[in-house]
Amino acid sequence: MSKPEFSTLIDLLQYRSHYQSARKAYSFLQNGEKEVNSLSYKELDEKARAIAVELQKQVDRNERALLLYPQGLEFIAALFGCLYAGVVAIPAPPPDPIRLKRTLPRLEAILFDAQASVILTDFSKYSQLKESTSELSSEFKRIKWIVSDKIPTALSQKWQKPDINSDTLAYLQYTSGSTSTPKGVMLTHKNLIHHCSYIKEAWGYTSDSIATTWVPHFHDYGLVDGLIQPLYSGIPCYVMSPIAFYMRPIRWLQTISRYRVTHSQGPNFAYEHCLRRTTAEQRANLDLSSWRTASNGAEPVRQETVENFIATFEPFGFRRDALYPAYGLAEATLLVSTKKHGEKARVLTLAAEALEKNRIVVVSPAEKEQVVRFVVSCGPPIGGMKVAIVNPFTLRKCQPDQVGEIWVCDPSMAVGYWNRLEETKKTFHANLAESGEGPFMRTGDLGFLKDGELFITGRIKDVIIIRGRNHYPQDIELTVEKSHPSLRSSHGAALAVEIKGEERLIVVQEVERSYQKTLDINEVVGNIREAVTDEHDLQVYSVVLIKAGSIPKTSSGKIQRSACRVKFLEGTLDQWEARVKVTSKSGAAVSS
């Protein structure tokens, strides 16, 4: 069998179907435990062709289709059904019938922005939504619906391959909208094929690899590395729902142990969740020695999480060099940089005062004379990616010891944003001021390169600037959550709000449900204020403690700081109890 060259994802799946027809491609684990159904490459190809025939009857090539599916194999078939029809797929989080008022607006915005012609879903989700017809907008009522799991496989015989090539749009990846309105990132077949070759090399996928994923399929991490990469590499993938993982994170680790999984991924909170929500008794039966690549990306990677996860799970076979901190974004298809094979995750200890001035000063971890920040390396850029650190205002390259905006150049970069010419030009066609070099894609993220490795410090739009000093919200949020055991990890936001002509620091933080009846507000607020002052030399103007599960988040779980800011100003945060005034040692008034 000669080495294959693929122009499109259709070519890729048809190759697998022809040469590895009976090999298991995907299996679904009900409740994250029991394998209830699976698809071979041949079966997936047949289902995709059947769905494509139905699509080709109802819509024209290059029209858009919204995919609303629970996590599972039917989504994968629908995605490839769209590709096989030459229709642009739009993976999206299905609306929750119980919380339609909260989950529908984002979907309606996507539907309107993409001008989708059809919605694909399965029978169970279709039935749920039809029961909620009165709450659906006119946009949802007017559009065509296709229930894909009711399409007979026999239709596959009528499929005609669409006239597409490597530059054809495969799907729109709507960004999570952590700092803005979601935008549709346009990804071509060439973007995806090219990028999968990078990932295969960077994360060491081989023909004997085995994958599992629970990361949502509508998120770039779950879609590209979780689902498409196993197909590209020709390896089996075990799929479970995010809810199954979140309710009992041990299920993820048990799946890795049971099926001898080599590759799986998750954002930092997933590794933290495993630390907090698994017991010694549950961990006792794990064997994680097969896990070669545990990638950690999609949100800031915390040094404390990395070290604690390794220390906790090393006795059960987890290897220190298996944890791969990574950096990426949908606009780059997925991955920009990650740790090298065989090396430990690198952590730099930086002088906090210098970092506030966008300077990089490395100090000893044992340094007691000054406040320090720990920053985890996300490794060198993958493949042939070119990364530049640029002053976002002058558009000139930063000095090696300076923090700047991360710019990226590579064929994996997306075509642009759907129907947003100005934003596409600004983001994807940037050139360096002094040399004209480019075009680069502007990430909007801040960081620096040291010894060829990329370190991330924050988002430009989230940086808190008070009295001329830069403060990264994630650093303050970590300080806050560690200040009292009642505060939920990764469920807080540090914000800057202008009050009486001056930028002030606001802290919004969720409280654990178990503390609802016993919480001493004065103690918690006092701890928060003291910790932030000690660690960051900042005065907290206002603390708002809110109910568990109420902080604004994106569909992929990222804190929406901009939405928190709006809700704070509107007074619409779901507070733990009525706002009261607490006086700090310094005499400043704080809300709680």
Curated annotation (Swiss-Prot):
GO terms for cellular component: plasma membrane. One of its GO terms (molecular function) is ATP binding. The keyword ATP-binding applies. It is an enzyme of class 6 (ligase). Keywords: ATP-binding, Fatty acid metabolism, Ligase, Lipid metabolism, Nucleotide-binding. It comes from the Bacteria. InterPro entries: AMP-bd_C, AMP-bd_C_sf, AMP-binding_CS, AMP-dep_synth/lig_dom, ANL_N_sf, FAAL/FAAC. Induction: Part of the jamaicamide (jam) biosynthetic gene cluster, encoding enzymes catalyzing most or all of jamaicamide biosynthesis. Its EC number is 6.2.1.47. One of its GO terms (biological process) is fatty acid biosynthetic process. It catalyses: a medium-chain fatty acid + holo-[ACP] + ATP = a medium-chain fatty acyl-[ACP] + AMP + diphosphate; a medium-chain fatty acid + ATP + H(+) = a medium-chain fatty acyl-AMP + diphosphate; a medium-chain fatty acyl-AMP + holo-[ACP] = a medium-chain fatty acyl-[ACP] + AMP + H(+). SUPFAM superfamilies: Acetyl-CoA synthetase-like. Belongs to the ATP-dependent AMP-binding enzyme family. Ligase involved in the biosynthesis of jamaicamides, which show sodium channel blocking activity and fish toxicity. Initiates jamaicamide biosynthesis by the activation of the starter unit, 5-hexenoic acid, followed by the loading of the activated 5-hexenoic acid onto the acyl carrier protein JamC. In vitro, can also use 5-hexynoic acid, heptanoic acid, butanoic acid, hexanoic acid and benzoic acid. This is Medium-chain-fatty-acid--[acyl-carrier-protein] ligase JamA.
